[in-house]
Amino acid sequence: MNQLVVAFPFWHWLVEPLQYEFLIRAIWVSAFVGLVCAVLSCYITLKGWSLMGDAISHAVVPGVVLAYALNIPFAIGAFTFGFGATVAIGYVKSKTRLKEDAVIGIVFTGFFALGLVLVTKIPSNVDLFHILFGNVLGISQQDIIQTLIAGSITLIVILLRRKDLLLFCFDPNHAKAIGLRTQVMYYTLLSVLALTIVAALQTAGIILVISMLVTPGSIGYLLSDRFDHMLWYSVVSSVLSCVLGTYLSYHFDVSTGGMIVVILTTLFVIAMIGAPKYGILAQEWRKRSGPNPEDDENQTVVVDQV
């Protein structure tokens, strides 16, 4: 056996983490979270809701703290405060002359600050570092169940309302004109966004979860005009980053969420530079070759070809 290890050091490096049950559990949980985030990421990217995702991810902090203090599932507290923040944003926006970005900034920082106050004042077993950056390597069985439930609900809702959500994200005015209840779609998308953040909380934490919600869809958006292909690229890049990031975090003894996002960002940079049609190199080549009529269409064919 020792001779085999010496002869095949890479194989030993590869299989060593698989000897530990906690790491195997962390890998498949991360992969599931990556799948959920990737699917929703395509809709968030088309809708331009990256800031909304950031707001909700910060707003769940007081919910998590209170949930642990009251000994109730963290998913309930996180979803309640996350969705509550979106309702607050919509209410303040409708009652004032402030623009949405200003309202989002005010609401999410207020919720986040409340969470920090609660962390320091309410006795609980909540580790602020784990809230901020995740703790998938130490995830409990109860947290896994909550993550699976939240993620599964998100996937089911998106599957059932896929076309309606896509039309709402791409052209809400047209969706309203054909009789689609855009207000329902608005809160449906916000609900699954809050659920996805709850699912990803243990893997990436509130600081890094926004990257998992935005980057996969952005990668797919750069690589393809078709929404189904965009979805495929998004899922592959996200799941690959989650599995590889969890794996490498063990070997290099670094933050799992941080490593996942580093790999995901690296894939984005590669796509940004080398995407066949919308990459930097392709655009520079077209500039030197002369104008291309297809450039005027940009990404509007995403929905046309679904």
From Swiss-Prot:
Transmembrane intervals: 26-46, 49-69, 72-92, 102-122, 142-162, 180-200, 203-223, 229-249, 256-276
Nucleotide-binding listed as a keyword: no
Cytoplasmic topology ranges: 47-48, 93-101, 163-179, 224-228, 277-306
Chief subcellular location: membrane
Localization per record: Cell membrane
Gene Ontology terms: biological process: response to zinc ion; transmembrane transport
Keywords, sorted A to Z: Cell membrane, Manganese, Membrane, Transmembrane, Transmembrane helix, Transport
Entry-linked SUPFAM superfamilies: ABC transporter involved in vitamin B12 uptake, BtuC (SSF81345)
Transmembrane helix found in the keyword field: yes
Coiled coil segments of this chain: none
Topology in membrane: Multi-pass membrane protein
Job of this protein: Part of an ATP-driven transport system for manganese.
PANTHER family in alphabetical order: ABC-TRANSPORTER METAL-BINDING PROTEIN, IRON TRANSPORT SYSTEM MEMBRANE PROTEIN HI_0360-RELATED
Protein name: Manganese transport system membrane protein MntB
Organism, as annotated: Synechocystis sp. (strain ATCC 27184 / PCC 6803 / Kazusa)
